[in-house]
């Protein structure tokens, strides 16, 4: 499945449960765009009162010019790594938007155009840790869309990875790129 984004302003929502790392993924994506690709980007986040298990989302807007409204109006891309997130946010996806779901966590998708990949399983197979699923997700997202350069996301992941885990996180990112290439039939 080849993915094209038509808008100059790209609105991305990464949503799941607390502890799945979607907020960190949003921060890394925004840093890749703003710091390493010299694009304008803004990142916002919200989460429930629970430290783990409650709903959480990160929104990233990337554009060539000034970003005058810092929230997603209608998502170009929705990444849903929990059923609750998919159910809650899929209706706010643009008609031609891209829905990426973790098939390990999301059983019901509202469209046959969804890109369904076993993200958590890929993370465990690659790094032995489900916590790296957020970085696998970034590889898939960037690999499918090209919203930031591969070099930018690699630098941003390496900069945010806890000391001593850079190699593991870059392996998770690479796994995401491989999954995106397979989804694109390349």
Question: Where in this protein do the model-derived segments appear?
Answer:
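Active-site cofactor/cluster-binding pocket
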Residues: 2-186
């Amino acid at each position: 499945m080849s993915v094209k984004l038509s808008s100059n302003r790209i609105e991305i929502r990464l949503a799941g449960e607390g502890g799945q790392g979607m907020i960190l993924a949003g921060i890394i994506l925004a840093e890749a765009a703003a710091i390493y690709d010299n694009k304008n980007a803004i990142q916002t986040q919200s989460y429930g009162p629970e430290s783990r298990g409650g709903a959480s989302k990160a929104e990233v807007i990337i554009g060539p010019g000034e970003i005058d409204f810092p929230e997603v109006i209608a998502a170009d891309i929705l990444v849903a790594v929990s059923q609750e997130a998919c159910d809650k946010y899929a209706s706010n996806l643009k008609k031609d938007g891209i829905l990426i779901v973790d098939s390990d966590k999301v059983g019901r998708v509202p469209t046959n155009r969804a890109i369904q990949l076993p993200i958590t399983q890929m993370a465990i197979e690659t790094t032995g840790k489900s916590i790296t699923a957020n970085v696998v997700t970034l590889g898939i997202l960037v690999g499918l869309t090209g919203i930031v350069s591969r070099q930018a996301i690699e630098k941003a992941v390496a900069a945010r990875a806890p000391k001593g885990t850079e190699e593991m996180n870059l392996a998770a990112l690479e796994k995401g790129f491989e999954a995106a290439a397979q989804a694109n039939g390349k």
